[in-house]
């Protein structure tokens, strides 16, 4: 998979007059991240998960728009590349977007990450671009593709709930793996509209199911939030995440035991 992604990224860059002689894969998971060395550009290339044909181009367009808006407001986000059209581009069955290279991944300082997430929310508070409401439509589309089962139905019922609170533009998947040192938040592909506590649910979920101290610290550093609304948002976010895990299982069978454990936890707390 990563070899195909690298070839696609290098080819599109070359079409724009930019040559990468030494590309290197930074990450191969939901997306393949390719540093197009020696260029200060990272290509994010669709891996086929959860969409075998790549994510809808509208999702990538929304991501670039939201990240660009936050960057112009001075928020701590990875900006799109300004050396070529950031995309989205299609090549060899992949969907590709180009971003500024900000250095090698290192451990993120959680206090700074939490504070930066609040600043992003402040920057996006007046964003008026079209965004989906939470991940409701995405969850329905994902569960429609899965073989019917009690687990799938359970996730669907949880995930279509609509928490209260004041809605605004959100990151959409604000766990610490989507924050680079700096800190710089990235991966706005699932940007959506909802209460800020929906973003905080990603940090709370990592704390709850993995006893992840950095996530707990980041949540504390974020500052004031509605704890009851966060508790309302958490299972809605978790249902979307675990439905995505189900789609990924054919390519990433190692997720199977993790998914089973997470579903038991979700049923024990929210069934």
Feature-to-residue mapping (PLM):
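A conserved alpha-helical element in kinase catalytic cores
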Residues: 2, 6-9, 44-92, 108-120
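An alpha-helical support segment within catalytic cores of ATP-dependent transferases
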Residues: 4-10, 125-172, 269
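ATP-binding glycine-rich phosphate-binding loop
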Residues: 16-37
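Active-site acidic catalytic loop and adjacent metal/ATP-binding pocket
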Residues: 30-37, 41-44, 158-200
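ATP/Mg2+ or Mg2+-diphosphate-binding catalytic cores
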Residues: 47, 133-141, 145, 213, ...
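Conserved short submotifs of the Hanks-type protein kinase catalytic core
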Residues: 92-104
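Conserved kinase catalytic-core helix
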Residues: 102-132
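Active-site activation/catalytic loop segments of kinase-like enzymes and analogous catalytic loops
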Residues: 197-226, 236-253
